[in-house]
Amino acid sequence: MSSLINNAMSGLNAAQAALNTASNNISSYNVAGYTRQTTIMAQANSTLGAGGWVGNGVYVSGVQREYDAFITNQLRAAQTQSSGLTARYEQMSKIDNMLSTSTSSLATQMQDFFTSLQTLVSNAEDPAARQALIGKSEGLVNQFKTTDQYLRDQDKQVNIAIGASVDQINNYAKQIASLNDQISRLTGVGAGASPNNLLDQRDQLVSELNQIVGVEVSVQDGGTYNITMANGYSLVQGSTARQLAAVPSSADPSRTTVAYVDGTAGNIEIPEKLLNTGSLGGILTFRSQDLDQTRNTLGQLALAFAEAFNTQHKAGFDANGDAGEDFFAIGKPAVLQNTKNKGDVAIGATVTDASAVLATDYKISFDNNQWQVTRLASNTTFTVTPDANGKVAFDGLELTFTGTPAVNDSFTLKPVSDAIVNMDVLITDEAKIAMASEEDAGDSDNRNGQALLDLQSNSKTVGGAKSFNDAYASLVSDIGNKTATLKTSSATQGNVVTQLSNQQQSISGVNLDEEYGNLQRFQQYYLANAQVLQTANAIFDALINIR
C-alpha cells in the first residue's frame, strides 16, 4: 500500500515540477536572453520484493536549459562581424550623403570658380569680373572648409564613441565577473544544480559585450566563464574583471585609442589592427581606412589646387604691372612626435612639389640604425637615409632631421591634414589679380588668365595623375562604391545572423504552442497520478472498513 501511495506522490511532485517549468517558460517568453527549460525526470531506485525488483516511482533530477554551445558560438561570431560592418556602414553613409549633395558640393563650387575665371579671361579689364572671381574664390574656400570641418567633427565623434564603447565593455566585464561569482557559489549550495536564471543573464551580457568587441568564451570547471577579446587580451578571469581605458594615442594625441589597464605596466595601448570586430572594431576601421583616406584625399586636392594656382598666378602680372602674388594660403605639413620617444630627434617637413604629394599619412620610425617610412594608406615601407644636411625627399616632400634618435623612436607625418583648415584667399584687391603675362602689357592682356584657366583640365595636377575635377569625381565615386559595398556586406551578414538566430531559437527559444501542449500533457499526468492516489485511498478505506 505504501508503495502505491509513494509512487503516486512522486508522480504528483514530478508533474507539479513539470507544470511549473512550462508555466515559467510561458511567462518568460518575452524576456531577452531567456533559454527554454525542461524538467528532467528519472526512475527512483527499485526495491527488492518477494516477486523481484519493484519500482518506486519517479524523481526530478534537475531542470535543464535547452542550450547548444556550438550554435551559440557560431551566432556570436556572426553577430560581432555584423555589428562591425553595420557600425562602419553607418559612419560611411554619412560621408557619402555629404559628398553627394549636388547643390553645395565642392564640384559645384569649383565649377563656379572656373566659370567666373572664364568670364574674367573674356573681360580681363572688367573690375566687376575681377571682383566676382574673388567672391567665387571665397565661396570655394568656404566649401573646402565646410567639408573638412564635417570630417573633423566626425573624427571627434569617433573619439566619443570609443570612450563610450570602453565604458560599456568595462561595465559588462564587471557584471559578468560578478555573475561568475554568484553562479559558482549558488551551484555549490545547490549540490551541483546551476541557477538557470543567472546563466541566462550571463549569456545575454556576453552577447551584448560581443557586439561591441569580439570576444571568445572558455568555460572552466563549475561553469565559470573566462572571456578574452579576439586579440587575446583577457577581460574576465573567473570573478575578476579586467579593465580597458580610452586614452590619447601616443602617435597622435588628438585621437582616442584603446588601452589595456595593467596593474604593473599601467595603460598598454592595443594596436588598433587587433580590434577589428564588433561595433568598436567597426568605428576604428572606419577611422583608419575610410575617414583618414577621405580627409587626405580632400586635403591633397586642396593643396594641389592652391599650389598650382599660386605658382601660375605668380608667373603673371596684375593690373598695376606688379608681379603676381600667392592667391591662396594653404596649410603646411604636420609632423607629430610619438610621446614615448626617448631620443631628442626632431623632424620638419615642407612641400616641394604639390602635384606629387599623395593622399596618405606616413609613419616614420627608427630601427636597426635606419629610418623606415611607411605609407599608411597602402602599408608600403621603404628606407630613407638623410644626407649631410639631414634632408630626405620623397613623394613631393622634403624632410629635415635634427638631433639624435633612439631605437624605436617614431613620428607621424601628415602632409595634408592641416591644408584646408589654414586655407584662405589672400587676394582681396581685384587689381592684384595677375591676368597679364607681361609687366606692361595693359589691362586687356589675359594670357596668364588663360594659363590659370587651363589648370582646370591639366590631368597631372593632383597626385601627378588627375585633374581637379577628376580627383574630386574619383573621391565621390570611391566613397559611393565603398558605401554600397558595405551596405551589401552588412545586409548579407545580417541575414547570416538571422538564420543562426532562428536556428538557435529553435533549440533555446520558447514555442508557445509547444508549451500549451506541455501544460495539457502534464495536467493529464498530474490527474492520472491523483487518480492512483485516490485508488490507493479507496483501497485503504476498504481495508479499514473490514470487520
Curated annotation (Swiss-Prot):
Pfam families: Flg_bb_rod, Flg_bbr_C, flgK_1st_1, FlgK_D1. GO terms for biological process: bacterial-type flagellum assembly. The keyword Secreted applies. It comes from the Bacteria. GO terms for cellular component: bacterial-type flagellum hook; extracellular region. Its main location: secreted. It is found in: Secreted; Bacterial flagellum. Keywords: Bacterial flagellum, Secreted. One of its GO terms (molecular function) is structural molecule activity. Belongs to the flagella basal body rod proteins family. This is Flagellar hook-associated protein 1. It comes from Escherichia coli (strain K12).
